[in-house]
Regions:
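Short, solvent-exposed loop/linker segments at the N-terminal edge
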Residues: 41-45, 130-136
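A short beta-strand micro-motif common to beta-rich folds, especially ectodomain repeats
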Residues: 83, 93-106, 180-192
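Surface-exposed binding patches on compact interaction domains or structured appendages
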Residues: 33-35, 54-82, 123, 144-171
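Bacterial Sec-dependent N-terminal signal peptides
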Residues: 13-40, 105-124, 196-208
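Aromatic-rich peripheral "rim/lid" segments of glycoside hydrolase catalytic domains that contact
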Residues: 509-578
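Sec-dependent bacterial lipoprotein signal peptides
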Residues: 1-18
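Active-site region of glycoside hydrolase catalytic domains
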Residues: 332-475, 484-504, 537-538
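Active-site mouth of glycoside hydrolases
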Residues: 211-213, 217-396, 400-411, 539, ...
Length: 578
């Protein structure tokens, strides 16, 4: 802005001088005395600037610098002379100054001339180059700039250091790439002039990854899991995708990074598929929807987190009909959908797991016959995934107990068994836990029967004296007993358990005038803590059900910090028995 001001001032003064009458030079405002129109000049590049002089005789103009030149003054009449000042092109980065002396018979004056250096940002070197290791690593960019800079980088680079100096080195770490080859630009831009920038493009090929870990090993690495709930399982309607229709935002990479920063290292992605079919006769899923799910999986596994993709409720085409007996039409859908899902996601290594269903039989009575139907569809899931080969030939697969109910999953009379799999040690069992349900799920007082109000306070140490909102069942010992059932039935036999969902509903104090808000929040945090700890202590991997109430879906930051703190306390305290 300073340079533009000098130029504007020069033009204004020059116009003022040259518009004077030859017969009345006092109108110029410089009188009969010696006068030079400029005492300071800023030269932009090599563009000349005009100087006007009022003198009794032709002035002499002398520059003290070789790069600074003056033309011979021209006489414009009435004692007015003009000359141009120009400079050689300045290819350096520094600012240089010179002095021009103007002398006539009736006076002398000096003009201070400034020429700014060349503005630039230059990439001096990159280490180890611009082609990155597929398995992850660290890169450095050495650059020089003539001023402070703004820096933009692709989301998959994490800054180690970042400085805005005349010369500096940027360092970034990057994780292994388990998806397609990816490229990203690092752009360094001068803050003072955004048109001046330098760009370096990095490329990272995908790694083949590792598929050697069994289910127990992978489960032991899952510190704390979370669901992207009410998002990818929202059905499409009239060609409009459902993602974001039930929540405040679509999934983005900053949200995923936020989950990792909180301490989660495993993410369950409930998915709808049936409403995304573009050819019903052949059960063909929209390839663009498969790509979108793959994109989210890629964000997760490239953060070195684990991902679970399932077929969720999905309109109930399978889960609501297991009580009707086996259906070849449903079985074909199960086969065709999983063949496409597994094929599209085959490139991901053992960080990705598949879950064949969600809560089979939840909306109908569970009998041994119903269980047999569930088992047939789960066998189809295994066969379809394994048939796609590649990484899927040995990928860990998750099988849902009847209704994902703990008691029904361990009930010997129902005769639930895992499907046959030629690959040993790659199976996990899934259950969900919303106990006590009148604390976690009940939406309205007495909706499930008389004298059944919503409960607000779980854990005896957080009960409120005299309140009918204290939980009267499902306390700590009950939670331990339930997870112990899964430990005895499966974990002790080498089969880890996934707690695919658990959470308690967020209650609005405005709906409960009598609520002790502090005690309620302490209680909810404690429920999160205890469920998480007890699950891990019994060999069950916890995946918290979250739909945007506890965590901001845009930036991945906590909305209910107390709830997240409870989860992390439980994750830290819990120790897997394997």
């Amino acid at each position: 802005m300073i340079r533009l001001s000098y130029i504007a001032l020069s033009l204004a003064l020059a116009l003022g001088f040259t518009s004077c009458s030859d017969d009345d030079y006092n109108e110029c405002g410089i009188g009969n005395d010696f006068k030079v129109s400029r005492s300071e000049i800023a030269l932009a590049a090599s563009a000349p600037q005009t100087v006007t002089v009022r003198a009794a005789s032709a002035p002499a103009v002398v520059s003290d610098s070789e790069w600074l030149h003056a033309t011979t003054p021209a006489h414009n009449g009435a004692g007015i002379y003009t000359f141009d000042l120009a400079a050689d092109e300045h290819t350096g980065y520094d600012t240089r100054t010179g002095i021009v002396t103007v002398t006539a018979s009736n006076g002398s004056s000096q003009i201070s001339v400034t020429q700014y250096g060349h503005e630039t940002v230059e990439i001096l070197s990159t280490t180890p180059g611009t082609t990155l290791e597929p398995t992850g690593g660290t890169l450095s960019i050495h650059y020089a700039a003539t001023g402070d800079v703004d820096i933009t980088v692709p989301h998959w680079l994490d800054a180690v250091t970042s400085k805005s100096l005349t010369e500096s080195t940027l360092s970034y770490t990057y994780n292994a790439n388990y998806s397609e080859t990816r490229t990203g630009d690092v752009v360094i831009t001068l803050k003072s002039d955004p048109s001046v920038s330098a760009t370096v493009t990095f490329t990272q090929d995908a790694t083949e990854g590792v598929m050697t870990s069994d289910a127990k090993t992978i489960a032991s690495r899952m510190y704390a899991g979370i669901n992207i709930g009410n998002t990818m399982e929202c059905p499409a309607s009239n060609g409009v995708w459902g993602e974001g229709q039930w929540t405040t935002a679509k999934v983005n990479v900053n949200y995923i990074k936020g989950l990792k920063a909180m301490g989660f290292n495993a993410v369950r992605i409930p998915c709808a598929w049936d409403s995304y079919v573009i050819d019903a006769a052949n059960n063909t899923i929209d390839p663009a929807w498969l790509d979108r799910v793959s994109e989210i999986v890629g964000w997760i596994v490239n953060e070195d987190m684990y991902a679970i993709v399932n077929i969720h409720w999905d309109g109930g085409w399978l889960e609501n009909h297991v009580g009707d007996g086996y259906s070849s039409t449903i079985d074909r859908k199960q086969h065709d959908y999983w063949t496409q899902i597994a094929t599209r996601l085959n490139k991901y290594d053992e960080h990705l797991l598949f879950a064949g269903m969600n809560e089979p039989g939840m909306n109908g009575g569970i009998t041994s016959s119903t269980v047999q139907t569930i088992m047939k569809y789960q066998q189809t899931f295994v066969d379809a995934v394994r048939a796609t080969g590649g990484n899927n030939a040995v990928r860990c697969l998750i099988h849902q107990g009847p209704e994902t109910n703990i008691d029904k999953t361990v009930d010997a009379s129902l005769q639930y068994k895992l499907p046959v799999d030629n690959v040993t040690g790659r199976a996990l069992v899934e259950i969900h836990n919303y106990d006590p349900s009148n604390y976690t799920l009940l939406e309205e007082d007495n909706a499930w029967g008389p004298n059944m109000p919503i409960k607000l306070y779980w854990g005896s140490k957080f009960h409120v004296a005299g309140s009918d909102r204290n939980c009267d069942w499902g306390q700590e010992d009950f939670i331990d007993q339930q997870y112990k059932k899964m430990q005895d039935a499966y974990v002790s036999k080498g089969i880890p358990v996934i707690v695919g969902e658990y959470s308690s509903m967020i209650r609005n104090p405005a709906d409960f005038p009598e609520m002790d808000v502090e005690r309620y929040e302490q209680s909810r945090a404690y429920w999160n803590e205890y469920q998480t700890m007890s699950a891990k202590n019994h060999g069950c991997v916890p995946f918290y059900w979250e739909t945007g109430g506890d965590i901001n879906r845009t930036n991945g930051k906590a909305l209910k910090q107390y709830a997240i703190d409870g989860l992390m306390r439980g994750a830290s305290a819990g120790v897997y028995p394997f």
